Amino acid sequence: VGHEHVERCRPFLEAGLPMFIDKPLVNSEEDLRTFVKWHDDGAQFLTSSSMRYCKEYEPYYANHYELGELMYICSPMSKKYETYGIHALESMYPLLGPGFVSVQSTGTYERSMMHILHEGGCAVDIPQGIGMAGAGILMIGSKGSNYIQCRDSYYAFKKQLDLFVHWLRT
């Protein structure tokens, strides 16, 4: 839980130990400022979502030519945006790269809906709520569309940790 990470990580990061921090990194701007300061001071930490490493998504990260230019992505997730929204964001970041220009939240606390626009023109929706099934991406492009589900969570978690260990060694 993000609101506990500053105090839990403080002794390790201030002692110079590298850390992997589970999602979400923070839940407040104040805590984010603390992590930014630690980063700027040379602390080594990594946080990510295992959804970025779903093997079902990987072929599309390398090339999605059969879909053409991505125009719309919908990535429904279960639970609350504050704790699980990062899964949707991380799974689409390798598809779109940097350049998100606007975020609009509609819906309610129980059933959130995030509308995001990327500078490349792709619109993104992330519907979330308790009891809602998720862990997939609907991609609609100029030439086709596809819905892909992440089914092998073991692979995703293992790859995430393997890459963290590689990061530690380099």
Model features per residue range: what roles?
Residues 6, 29, 158:
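Glycine-rich phosphate-binding loop at the start of an alpha helix
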Residues 20, 25-85:
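A contiguous active-site-proximal alpha/beta segment in oxidoreductase catalytic domains
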Residues 2-3, 25-26, 51-53, 108-109, ...:
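Short beta->alpha connector loops
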Residues 70-132:
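Rossmann-like dinucleotide-binding domain that binds NAD(P)(H)
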Residues 2-21:
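Rossmann-fold NAD(P) dinucleotide-binding segment
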Residues 57, 88-89, 158-162:
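A general structural signal for well-ordered alpha-helical segments in protein cores
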Residues 105-170:
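NAD(P)-dinucleotide binding in Rossmann-like oxidoreductases
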